[in-house]
């Protein structure tokens, strides 16, 4: 499952839905407000994945995480200050939380995650586009499960 904490760019949302499909995620969860909706741009960028990948809109992301935790899911959020994703065991039922393009994962959502994961980087720039970060982390989760 991929949860998006206020992703605003419809191109990012479409690319993430496409990634969710190719890594066989169960779906994508987005907030009802303060984020990109399911627009024609999202559909086009998803390259058709929007037709096969469930997308749920929720009112409260934190409450959604808490409810899914009660059903046995664990949550890992992407953050530059986290533990290297290669050091985490992400083989079980994982919800991958990706934050807003400018602000990252909100404080309350981050506090409800079980792990905070970072993507090791070498260059002068220390951040990735939200959809790229989603792809890198989603493929690490998939790799661990193979």
What are these regions (language model features)?
Residues 1-146:
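Post-transcriptional modification and biogenesis factors for structured RNAs
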